[in-house]
Amino acid sequence: YGEYASQPLVLNFHRTDHKDGSATYFREFLRQYMMAQRPNRSDYPAWNQRQYVIDSIAWVRDPLYGWCNKNFKKDGSPYNVYTDGLKVYTTIDSRMQRYAEEAVYGHVARYLQPEFDKEKQGQPNAPFSDALKPEEVRTILRNSMRQSERYRNMKAAGYTEGEIMKAFRTPTDMTIFSYHGDLDTTMTPMDSIRYYKHFLRAGFMSMDPKTGYVKAYVGGLDYSHFMYDMVTGGRRQVGSTIKPFLYSLAMGNGFTPCDKAPNVQRTYMVAGQPWTPRNGSHARYG
């Protein structure tokens, strides 16, 4: 006993936070959803009033939305997802989640990103389109700066716009993302914003069409560096998912799968003005 008691106690302990482990984007989405406050219109900017309506409906109709602020502990305080010992059961399949994360990361890192970098190589406006003017690029970077955590913290601390801009143009030590692992480097925060604009973003969500159960949820490549959730927050074109709705509407109005339509370019009057849909390839068909 004395021999073992004299040996140092070694613990292989690692505290896991919300940035570690599997399904990080889904876990954070669930935390925000369950801990949402009752929507207040004044908390939403003018351009995002639609989100206020969506959240207000969810607050009334969805018991899970804001659950922690609708249900209270014995002392009357609201629940906290992380500190009150709640057990939250989800429909995520751990194997599908792992496959999804590997597939998204692998496809972007090994295929899409190299193709994008090859296309932008040597272009002075990279990663932006050459069609953008320098002032338009600066506007994009300034808007991204104002959305950053560094900017919000400095603004809350009382710094002026000029002081914040100076800080964003001052080189500082930082850790940045790369596909080969995090890199320690020195650059200005504004340069880091442009650096991150080079990275393609991707999202993936797998759902059982019969039950609506979400089986896999990948909001991005790395939650530590890209916290914007491309599943619920990313805006994208509707794509081919519109087809079932469009075809259902057509058949509801008397069309059948056997009907034929001329494969020609059409022009429609919209608000008194002619409008002609065009393909991205500029081909005049389809």
Q: Where would I find each of the regions flagged by the language model?
A:
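Extended, non-catalytic substrate-recognition/exosite surfaces adjacent to catalytic cores, especially
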Residues: Y1-Q273, R278-S281
